[in-house]
Every structure is written in C-alpha cells, then in structure tokens.
Amino acid sequence: MKPRIDWIIHGCANGVVCEYFGETENGFLPGACNFHTHGMEKYSHLDFQMTLAYPPQELCRILNTMGLRVQVGERFKNGDMVSGIYEDCDVRLTEFEETGRKVLRIIVPDKHNRFPEDSECETPYQLQSLATEDIWQEGGFRQ
C-alpha cells in the first residue's frame, strides 16, 4: 500500500496572509513560527509541531516525514532523539501544549549541534524552548 498523507499541516508565520481575515501575520518573535499537524490521533499518536521559522517547504517536509513514520508504525514520545531527518544531526522531540492539546515539538539543534537549554545555543534555535504562547509578540495580528 502506497503511503498517503491523510493529515493536515496548519502553519502560522510572519508574512503569511490569513485566508479567513485577509490580514498579514506579524506577531511572532523573529525566527519563530507555529507549524503543526492535525490528524495523528487516527494513529493513536500525538501531533507534531515546529516553531523554528524555516521555509514552509522544509517545515512541511519534516512534519510529513514524521507523520509518514507514524503511519507505518513508529511511535515517538517526549525526549526521543530522532535520526533520519538530517544527515548531520538528530532532532529531539519535546512535549508542549499547542492550543489546548499536547503535541511533540521537533527541536532542531543549531549548527554546533547545541539544543536550546545550552546557554551557547544560537538565535533563533533557543526560541524552540519557549511555550507556544510565548513565541507571540503583543500587537501582532492573531485570529
């Protein structure tokens, strides 16, 4: 059976126009965003989230890669180190809350392989340790 993406990715980032309100998003801290899946519950699994403002295509590639791995039976939990996303480093999964539900945030280390809790972790990578509501600035557009 051919793998089929049967979940959605919801992405909010600076510069993105809201289809519903027609306003341009501008409220995230520089280097931060909120891209996350909806639909992993059909596999009895938490959804995934990324808050590092990579290009949308890269964020979707990573989120879909994780979703496809779940679809074929892999299970992930808080604290797991996951290989196969990047050739030169593992990513870490950390449980966070996103709009009232638990998700596994995919944490990418900086170019020196340092994670956010390392005091020398570079900007914007250290922002990945902030709660979802804390990557938002006052005065920005929010639905």
Predicted regions and their residues:
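Acidic, proline/glycine-rich low-complexity IDRs
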Residues: 1-32, 40-143
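Histidine-anchored nucleotide/phosphate-binding helix
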Residues: 37
